[in-house]
Amino acid sequence: MGMRFLQDDVTVIHSDEKEAAVYADILDLYTNREKSAAVVSEPNDPLVSIYFQAYNHLEDYTKPALDALLRYTADIDYELILVDNGSTDGTFEYFQLLPYPRKRIYRITKNIGAFFGYRAAKNATQGRFLRGKYFVGLPNDILVTKNWLQNMLICMESDERIGFVVPMSDNVSNLQYVDLGYSDFGDMQEKAALFNVSDPRKWYDRLRLIPTVCVIRTYLRELYEADYAFVYDFADDDISFAYRRLGYRIVLCSDTFVHHEGSTIVGVNQQEHSENLEKGRILFRRKYGVDAWSDVVNFEVYLRRALFERTQMRENARILGIDVRCGTPLLELRNTLRENGMNQTVLTAYTTEPQYWQDLASFCEGGVYCGDIDRLSCKIGDKTYDYIIMGTYMDCYEDVLAVIRAAAAHLSDGGALVCKMRNYDVPYDLQEIALALQNMPPRLVQGMYGCETELLQLPYEVEIYPYMEEVYDLKERFFAQLREVEAYQNDAHIRAVFSEERFDALMTQYAVVLRKRS
């Protein structure tokens, strides 16, 4: 497209050499978006637009981050969009001197927030703000590594339905963390170079991601950029949910590592931060009808481990998730199988809570069924599955054994079902645990203690695995605090009440695996 000429209030856009997109008769949302985006592109457009915003911290964050970027991204065609968001330490001057020809610099005179910095730079642009096929958001507390961007682009270009990818890192939660055990910057880069080997088996589908650094399709970014209601965190969660509900895959590239220094915000008031997190969580729940934490971070690591302890992994596996909330346990089973070379899976979900239907439907090719638990077999019919995972504690159902029997009836030959049980219903809260230890609550009628005998009599191979991994950190904190209390140190009775044995009895959970004989 040629130059744009302004004549009073008229803008002339020369499109003589452009051709309209040809969509043919294929009804494919993803292909059509790619074709439409290609029409407005220019021959000299870069492959990637890297957006980098900084507010002070020139020496300790910005310089190292950009030095690493220039060194380890030399093989990628990219433009660099630099935004100085009100810095007073020479950041703007450093941007001007940065030895990279394909850069654009925006200077914001006063910092009034990261959202404003991005929007102001975008609005000030004559023409397209993001000119690359892919958008990369690179914070100044990230040190990139060898092959970081190449690996993520390989992932993106493997499937046009992948809309948003993020690498592994340190100083991050959400099971995106990896410890390379390095001693300094040079050692980190050496170990990252060995780690960063593209491997499709390590591309994990997720419901949400924390974008330490992210790659997003530019047309998708323009379709949904951000919801500015999320001023109290959770903007990242919002982006993940928005893109996935549009039908796109959200992928964690666990074959790629970048170093995350941590927040550049100093002097954070922890109480205020916690309050803001809760505000953002409430806003997210109001928008999406689900909780960004409890409904999404149920990775069920131990259930998956118990399931495959003695169960053969199968290609073309049919997997059913029952009451798995938004569906993380289902995706994690798919990821586990993919990591072990089983690339084809079909996911199906059954939920007793309709608010989860939309998120489950975004990735369950086998369909989503919704109804009371006693309608399970009626809804599913005669379908069978290689793996069944049940996401809620079994004592939440009125008749535990009836539910297990009904679900297990849908196992294929050699298939396996995994569910979780407990003996006590105690929240994961230090104060609640302390109160329960002082006055032990009654065992759950539908808990493991009351059901174990009948479970073992079911016509399946039944194995029961006790575990405490989900409360391990909680236990460590609980007893670390107790050891600081003088009465605990000096009083044998108090130590007996708050003993590790009683804690374990209260908080132990059980993975129950049923295998149908071939």
What does each model-found stretch correspond to?
Residues F185, A193-T218, Y232:
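A recurrent flexible, glycine/aromatic-enriched loop bordering the glycosyltransferase active site
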Residues I142-G181:
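Conserved donor NDP-sugar-binding/catalytic core segment of glycosyltransferases
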Residues L207-V213, E222-H259:
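Donor nucleotide-sugar recognition loop
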Residues I108-R128:
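Glycine-rich, basic loop-to-helix element that forms the pyrophosphate-binding segment
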Residues D67-D77, T336-E339:
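Short, acidic, metal-binding catalytic loop of nucleotide-sugar glycosyltransferases
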Residues H57-R71:
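Short, well-formed alpha-helical segments that are part of the catalytic scaffolds
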Residues F129-L143:
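Short beta-strand-to-loop acidic/aromatic patch adjacent to the donor-nucleotide binding site
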Residues D84-E93:
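A conserved acidic beta->alpha catalytic loop
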